[in-house]
Amino acid sequence: MSTIAVIGSVNLDLVATVKKLPEPGETVTDAELSRFPGGKGANQALAAQRLGSDAKLIACVGDDAAAVEAQILLLEGGVDLSGVQSVADLPTGIAMIAVAPSGENHIVVAPGANRALTPDVLSVPVADALICQLEVPVDTVAAAARSFDGFLCVNLAPAMHVDVEILQRADLIIVNEVEAGWYGDSLSAASGMIATTVGAAGATITKNGEDIAFAKPPRIEAVDTTAAGDTFTAALTVALVEGQ
């Protein structure tokens, strides 16, 4: 069994299921509202745990009811939450998600306590692999990259400027096709593998500009694509660490 540490976000997702995603300036009034635990870090940790790994989450939440609700599935799933810190002066992160019948979504995140996971409070555990993403301060990701000696996966989402040291240190970088376009040629600084997901078309893995793998998923009827990328990130990391 592999041990997977995840440094990342914990959110409470407010999901509005709509018949059609609104256009800019448009209001839709037919939504059905649901609440779910979420956050890229939480999603990745839970996925790794469900895939048979021993997962530990390092994160920050608020001292509020949303924090309890956001961690329910993690607790039930057996994820080690000893690295989750509660902060008094910021609320738990909230993600507002609109989902269309096709499964496509629009997401807006209010990070709240996720911003409190700064390098000075960071404790990087011993693990076979570490997964990071960018819903926590990028300085924290850089600090983790410097101090962690094992397999490092960095999900460069949401897209933003990152130090070249992160690109050079990561054994695996994961982006979707939109993020890959945003980063452009800067990804050429990466020394490890780059996995680019292209939705229903699958994913390509490259290294040093050369394609080394391609996976095309089976056709299914999409219900909700929320957290699909997070699940892929966890699954690929677990598979590579365990030599699958």
State the predicted function of each range:
Residues 1-60, 65-72, 222:
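Glycine-rich phosphate/adenosyl-contacting loop at the front of the ribokinase-like
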Residues 99, 176, 204-208:
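Short beta-strand-to-turn element immediately C-terminal to the catalytic PLP-Schiff-base lysine
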